[in-house]
Amino acid sequence: MRVYVLNGPNLGRLGTRQPEVYGTTTYADLVELCQQTGRELGLEVVIRQTDAEQELLGWLHEAADLGACVVLNPAAWSHYSIAVRDACALLRAPLVEVHLSNIHAREEFRHHSVVSAVATGVICGLGVDGYRLALHHLAARAR
């Protein structure tokens, strides 16, 4: 089963951007974690990161066309991008929204995600373990 792991703006800066909020794991470490977890679960993991909303929309459309599951960390786009929300609504397979930090324990403007309403589930505040949990959930659903 193919699973897209898609990451939005600034996630390529993991490890150096606000480590007190996002931890010290680098983006390269996150990629390896997702690939390793995918191998253990028999998943084909396609992992991507972008700072360009248009690019993320294209990847979501690709996943929708293929009927692929998605693990999505929309980052800042969670809070205001109706375009990302609408692209997620096109998905025919499960979508798990992931956030490294607990968005409900941060600034007020981060408390609401427009994506959550169309997600199968949401994992937040568990750091990079959230990605591992999302992949395990999708693998279990496929059985």
From Swiss-Prot:
Pathway: Metabolic intermediate biosynthesis; chorismate biosynthesis; chorismate from D-erythrose 4-phosphate and phosphoenolpyruvate: step 3/7
MF-aspect GO terms: 3-dehydroquinate dehydratase activity
Site (Transition state stabilizer): R17
Self-association state and partner proteins as the record states: Homododecamer.
Keywords: Amino-acid biosynthesis, Aromatic amino acid biosynthesis, Lyase
The protein's role, per its UniProt record: Catalyzes a trans-dehydration via an enolate intermediate.
Catalytic site positions: Y22 (proton acceptor), H99 (proton donor)
Enzyme class per UniProt: lyase
EC numbers on record: 4.2.1.10
InterPro entries named in the record: DHquinase_II, DHquinase_II_CS, DHquinase_II_sf
Binding annotation for substrate: N73, H79, D86, L100, S101, R110
GO biological process: amino acid biosynthetic process; aromatic amino acid family biosynthetic process; chorismate biosynthetic process; quinate catabolic process
Gene: aroQ
Protein name, UniProt field: 3-dehydroquinate dehydratase
Stated family: Belongs to the type-II 3-dehydroquinase family.
Taxonomy, superkingdom: Bacteria
Catalytic activity, reaction form: 3-dehydroquinate = 3-dehydroshikimate + H2O
